[in-house]
Amino acid sequence: MPGRAAHQEAAAAGGAAAEPTAAGGSAGAVAQQPEQQGLAGAFPLVLKKLMENPPRDARLDKEKKIKLEEDEAAAASTMAVSASLMPPIWDKTIPYDGESFHLEYMDLDEFLLENGIPSSPTHLDLNQNPLMPVAKLEEKEPASASTGSPVSSSSTAVYQQSEAASSTESPPQNERNTPSPIDPDCVEVEVNFNPDPADLVLSSVPGGELFNPRKHKFTEEDLKPQPMIKKAKKVFVPDEQKDEKYWTRRKKNNVAAKRSRDARRLKENQITIRAAFLEKENTALRTEVAELRKEVGRCKNIVSKYETRYGPFDLSDSE
């Protein structure tokens, strides 16, 4: 009996121990289900994080790939623009430091020969473009006007009237070439001549204009030498005979003598100042003539050199 009781107690204890185990198993299964549901919900979040923030190595690879594609596109465009393998001219830089920069010598005659340009004017063919005489040119003008577009009758009439007026007004060619005569009085020579104002006053007629040595001209009578007049012999007149008639005649003679002396001195002063100016003007004109002769000689030398090289002038074409 005691053994049976002990066996029953042991079985009861085992059953009690088995119940907690079963309860623990069911509790573990219930706890495992929420954990699986949490992992399934966290996977999309992790994937989203990976897409937004990829690893560094993957990002570097992507940047290298994009840069490589851009370089290939730029190379393709460069090759499309220029088929040359050399870089463009504008990308080159030429250093200029005085030593590495050198100018190349080129012979001018060789350059002209390579390009087919004559080296001297004697090789030019003047017959390629000959100058047309004026007469032929005038003959061609009405022909070209007749073959051109038609013009209204009113404009044609106006043109003919103006042409007729110009033809009547225009002088002949010979008259046009001849220069108009120059008045010698209008020619002024630059002369450094400054006479004394006192001499000009003494050479001027009292109450008249100031004497101008540049413009004044003398007549032939003025320049003739004055005749020598012999003075009358002095006649002694006693004081008893010096009446009113004597003194009147004496005053008239003195006034006439003074007037003649003043006129003679005035003319002498004018001639002296005029002669001084003419001497200055003559010197200036001689200098100008010498310079003009030098210029004419230089022009003659140029013309002679031209004629010896190209032949004489053809004045018919120029006319």
UniProtKB/Swiss-Prot annotation:
This is Transcription factor VBP. One of its GO terms (biological process) is positive regulation of transcription by RNA polymerase II. It comes from the Eukaryota. Pfam families: bZIP_2 (PF07716). Transcription factor that binds to and transactivates the vitellogenin II (VTG2) promoter. Binds to the palindromic sequence 5'-GTTTACATAAAC-3'. Belongs to the bZIP family. PAR subfamily. CDD domains: bZIP_HLF. Isoform 1 and isoform 3 are expressed in a variety of somatic tissues, including liver, heart, intestine, stomach and kidney. Both isoforms are also expressed in hepatoma (LMH) cells and in embryonic fibroblast cell lines. Isoform 2 and isoform 4 are expressed in adult heart and intestine. Residues 1-35, 139-186 are annotated as: Disordered. InterPro entries: bZIP (IPR004827), bZIP_sf (IPR046347), PAR_bZIP (IPR040223). It is found in: Nucleus. SUPFAM superfamilies: Leucine zipper domain.
